[in-house]
């Protein structure tokens, strides 16, 4: 979700090597030159852009690029694993939008100031990667071990569920 070029340079080559997997990319920057860069990185896959396709074509595509705003949070429910962008720049984007769908969440190292990311890491529902090798090893483990994939997803979802109602709990403890 909300990927940047350093993120795309990690996950796109991995998916190029795994022909049976499908990818949904929601780039943070949807300028035409950035979309062309993404397209140039993808090899041997049928790629469609959300704004230029039909539901039938999107369902058949190997890669769906979300080239408009406002859809990302609802798109996570179609995935098995989420990669949250920004972790190789100033910081990651929203991890909870993906975790609420009971899926493992992966992100880069610039996540320390984000309490949700730290909580996901501690819960076992979130994973930090620093290199392509980290990402490749983790994705291979998740996709080849269904029990691990499901456990990590359940832990991510449980972490979000634990946060639900936090405002009510705080307000209940405050005497007015």
At which residue positions do the language-model features occur?
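Nucleotide-activated sugar donor-binding and catalytic core shared by glycosyltransferases
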Residues: 1-176
